[in-house]
Curated annotation (Swiss-Prot):
The modification Phosphoserine is found at residues 117, 121, 379. GO terms for cellular component: nucleus. InterPro entries: DUF2457. Residues 177-295, 315-347, 370-394 are annotated as: Disordered. Keywords: Nucleus, Phosphoprotein. It is found in: Nucleus. It comes from Schizosaccharomyces pombe (strain 972 / ATCC 24843) (Fission yeast). This is Uncharacterized protein C1259.08.
């Protein structure tokens, strides 16, 4: 950058430059100068171990707009020279940056942003030089100076990548756990197996049933004779059985004894006897607490129901007086004769009233009261208000 800035500062409008390294055949009159393209390249005398890249020969080309023949010729010559110069400069600069930078990744990014900037092409005729990857541009003499970079771990940004990372971690943990499990001592496994066998034998012996006599063999003598006539060959075969067969037979005997105990009639019957318990007060509905005629809410439901029954029976047994008309034709003949004898002397209404009075005392009392009221109705009414006022004054 220092070389580029110096060129821009020393450039003048009349076409003169401070540097005098311009060959004669490249000079163009100032009337045709419209733009300047330049780049920095090392000289042939410069050694590859120079401390700075800016030391070198500056070459530039003036690109005219007219005529077209000159422009095309300048494009062809300038593209070849610029591509060669730029490629050599970038290679030198990349090697120099890699050798001097302690952290190559940061320095390379800065140099890449500077060197990868395209050359100023106002007419757009020159070709852009090919890109050079600085990480791979290593000379054989500088291999030892490069710092080995550790491979960066990519961070998953999608759901699929995250799931793959999680599954990888789980697989690693599973492999580690399986390795630790394989390191368990065989002695512990054998002790566990022996303990389980002992517990199994103890359980089989604990639930082994007592031998029961066979009733059929005792009743039938023929069967007992058959049992006594067993051949000696069969006894030898039974004696030569292995321990495993004996254990299997013991297990079968214990199972058969358990099944016999379940089928025996001495045990509890298959169908249990269901005895219905007496209902509690909480199980009886609340409607029975309010029996008609009883208002005792604290009384139990059963007693309340009994009281309601006795109350209903007592109502049926009580005889209540009824209004019976003796003049009705269904009455007794004595009453009819008595009524017929008195009809001539008394009027029909009086006779009927007297007959009713015998059977219903309420009607007679009401009639007597009504008659007395009629008699006293002719007397003037008392002035109660005046009497009360006079008593108050006295």
């Amino acid at each position: 950058m220092t070389g580029l800035l110096s060129i821009l500062l020393h450039y003048k409008g009349n076409g003169d430059l401070a540097t005098t390294d311009i060959p004669s055949h490249e000079k163009i009159p100032s009337a045709k100068r419209t733009a300047v393209q330049f780049c920095i390249g090392p000289t042939h005398e410069q050694s590859p171990r120079m401390s700075t890249v800016s030391q070198g020969r500056v070459t530039f080309a003036v690109l005219p707009t007219k005529p077209k023949d000159e422009v095309t010729s300048m494009k062809a010559n300038g593209s070849r020279q610029s591509s060669c110069i730029v490629s050599n400069a970038r290679k030198r600069q990349s090697v120099h940056c890699l050798s001097r930078s302690p952290i190559p990744s940061t320095r390379l990014k800065e140099n890449d942003s500077r060197l990868c900037s395209p050359l100023a092409s106002p007419t757009g005729g020159l070709k852009r030089p090919a890109k050079v990857s600085f990480a791979l541009a290593n000379t054989p003499s500088r291999k030892g100076n490069l710092v080995p970079q550790s491979p960066r771990r990519t961070i998953a940004t999608t759901c699929k990548g995250v799931l793959e990372d999680v599954l990888k971690k789980d697989n690693e943990l599973k492999f580690n756990d399986s390795d630790e499990e394989d390191e368990v001592d065989d002695e512990e496994i054998e002790s566990f197996n022996s303990f389980s066998r002992k517990m199994q034998t103890i359980s089989n012996s604990r639930y082994r049933g007592s031998p029961k006599p066979n009733i059929e063999k005792q009743s039938c003598s023929s069967e007992s004779d058959r049992v006594s006539q067993i051949s000696d060959d069969e006894e030898d075969e039974e004696g030569s059985a292995d321990e495993e067969d004996e254990e299997d037979s013991d297990v079968e005997l214990s199972e058969s004894s358990l099944s016999d105990d379940e089928d025996s009639p001495l045990r509890c019957p298959s169908t249990p006897v269901q005895t219905a318990a007496a209902p509690n007060e909480s199980q009886i509905p609340d409607d029975t607490d309010f029996v008609p005629g009883t208002f005792d809410e604290d009384q139990p439901a059963c007693l309340a129901f009994a009281c309601s029954l006795t109350h209903a029976n007592s109502k049926r047994s009580i005889m209540l007086p009824q209004d019976i008309d003796p003049t009705f034709p269904d009455s007794e003949p004595e009453d009819d004769g008595h009524a017929s004898s008195t009809v001539g002397s008394l009027s029909k209404e009086e006779a009927r009233f007297k007959a009713k009075a015998k059977w219903n005392y309420k009607s007679s009392f009401s009639a007597h009261v009504s008659s007395e009221v009629l008699r006293n109705s002719k007397s003037p009414p008392l002035d109660i208000a005046r009497k009360a006022v006079g008593a108050h004054r006295v």
